[in-house]
Every structure is written in C-alpha cells, then in structure tokens.
UniProtKB/Swiss-Prot annotation:
Lineage start: Bacteria, Thermotogati, Deinococcota, Deinococci, Thermales
Keywords for the protein's UniProt record, in alphabetical order: Amino-acid biosynthesis, ATP-binding, Cytoplasm, Kinase, Nucleotide-binding, Threonine biosynthesis, Transferase
Protein name, entry field: Homoserine kinase
Gene Ontology biological process terms from the UniProt entry: threonine biosynthetic process
Residue sites binding ATP per the record: P84, L85, A86, R87, G88, M89, G90, S91, S92, S93, A94
Species: Thermus thermophilus (strain ATCC BAA-163 / DSM 7039 / HB27)
Amino acid sequence: MDLPRLYVPATLANLGSGFDALGVALDLYLEVEAHPAPEDAFLYEGEGHVEGTDNLIHEGYRAGMRALGLEPFPLRVRAFNPIPLARGMGSSSAALVAGVALADRLSGGRLGREGVFRVAAGLEGHPDNVAPAVFGGFVAALSDPPLAIPLPRPEGVRFVLAVPPYEVPTPLAREALPREVPLEDAIYNLARSALWPAALSSGKLEALREACRDRLHQPHRAPLMPGVLEAIEGALEAGALAAFVGGAGPTLAALARAGEEAPVIRALSAYRGPEGRTLVLGIGEGYFWKET
C-alpha cells in the first residue's frame, strides 16, 4: 500500500543553556514517500549525498518494527531532504524519526507518537533533537527515563540561521567537551535553562536573552567554529531575543521578532561567510502526514 507523504522537521538542540535537554522544531521538513516492495530501495534528493538501504530512515523503520515484535518487510523509500547535513539542524534525528513513524503507520498506529519518541530517542541517544521532531515546537526532554514535554509556543517570532559552509561532526564536538565542569558553571546553566519554560509560559521573551547563555558546551566547542562566540554577542546586540549554537554546530541560531530579522541577518553575515547561507524559518510542527 502507498502511504501519505511524511514530513519531519529540522530541529535545534540545546538552546544554549539546555544542553541535551531542550530543543525546538523548525518549519523546514524532510519529505518521505514509502511503500512495501519486493526488496529494499532508497532514492534520495537534496542536501549532501546519501545512498543505499543502510540509511537512517531504513534503520529507524527496522527498529520501529522490531520494537513492535514484527519482522521488517522490504520498503521502497524516496526522500527529499532540504535540511543541511552535519550542521546542527537535526538531519539525523529527522531521518530516524521518519523511519520509526513509517513503522508506526504501517502497523496501524501501534506505537503512537509517544512510542515513536521512545524508539527514536533510544536510537539517537540524545532526546533534544528527537523530541521536537516528534512533538513540534519547543520541547523539554529526558532520555532516561524517556520523557518529553512540549513547552508554550510564542507568536510572532522567527529563527535567523547562519549556516557556515563547513561541517562539525557530532563525535568531534563531543570530544571537545570536558569530563568535569566546575559547580558554579553547572549552576549557571541550570538556572538559565529554567528560564526557557518560564519565559515561554509568561510571555516575557526578553528573559530569553539570559536563558540562552551557556558555560557547559559552547565555549569548549568554539575553536571548532571560529568567531561563533563573538557572533552570538553580535546577534544579541542587533536585537535578537536569543542566540545560540544549533546542536553540535556550526549553525548559529538567533530568535528574533517577526519583522526585526534584518539587523540580525547583517550581524551574522561575517560568521556565515560568503560561501555559507542564511535561512529564516518559523517554529515547526511535529512530524505529520499529507495525502499527495
């Protein structure tokens, strides 16, 4: 049987202070078409180059089927991916969520959205990209136990993304982190991560300027992304409500009020570089299906 087309959003993890705990979906979507076939097949268009049936969509599909106690049957998958690869915008999470969502759909919804989150988070290892890809908007998430809670979604805001032309592989970014951190730095981040749900719930978005600040990961990864800390400060000085590295980077994300993006775009142009690109995106929905 042919399935409706599946859409899974790009995501930003960490939001500065909420390392491995907070994330947000963007309105830029991986598109997937799939149907049972005599043998596995994978057709890919879009960012980067991905081929073969040993891909993350098929991996997520197989994991979802096995979580249901079902033997995966061959699946022909066609994917169009506009999400930049290895740039900190959740391309891997989108693919894994897509695969698990396919298994859920083909099983008649036996996993449910919560089950899709649990299986995909188990594969990804970090829930802060998976949770917004599943539930949309801003989300707070844990991996052990697997738990995700959507946060209020502000109106009238947009993300300005400065996407440099180079990649920062997640394993390399993880290696840059210290094994231990000072207690005062942990407290610094804990206090500011609590500001995210407080500011979103109260509508006091000016507090996000402080909520996005971080001492646990961005300063340690900065040598992998030349000029990133200065660019964050430049975006805030240009009027951004918040600015932070997306996931492991190198994408720098700045949240701005709609209509006030232009000075933020200018402030981030040097960091993006002449071969990079700027994206302006709204807050995205969790994965959804649409008849073609």
